[in-house]
Amino acid sequence: LTLSAIEAVSLDHVLLEDDPINRDWIIFGTPVARSAQWSASKDGTTTTHVWDCTKGRFRWYFHADEIVHIIEGSVTVQADGIAERTLSVGDAALFRAGSWSEWEVEEYVRKHAILSSPLHPTVSFGVRAARRVARVFRPKAK
């Protein structure tokens, strides 16, 4: 598989497919969620997605670090010990891997999400070391 040096997409035109929220996580309403992945890193640890959801309140578990950027609508989020926050168009947030949060969508929300799976600490150390070595041999900018 050869990956392009640059991948670009119009987030408004990404075709989403049904991606149901776990029924046990729904607090109220009948939220309908859809999503699509549009790219992945070479090593597979980072992926980019577009996700949307209709009205409802639910809990959400983050299996990976997830950076979200709201591109339409809004959502109110909260987590244990963290004040409630409404994210609207243009807002971004980071949800840490292994955490739970509560999401309340008043009408509709659409987000762009970047998911990064955490590496085991020993692998992480090796990656950081390899990057340091690679910097020494990096070609000079033209």
Cite the ranges covered by each PLM segment.
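Short, conserved beta-strand element in jelly-roll/cupin
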Residues: 53, 62-77
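Double-stranded beta-helix
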Residues: 104-142
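Short hydrophobic/aromatic-rich beta-strand segments that constitute the beta-sheet cores
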Residues: 60, 77, 111-114
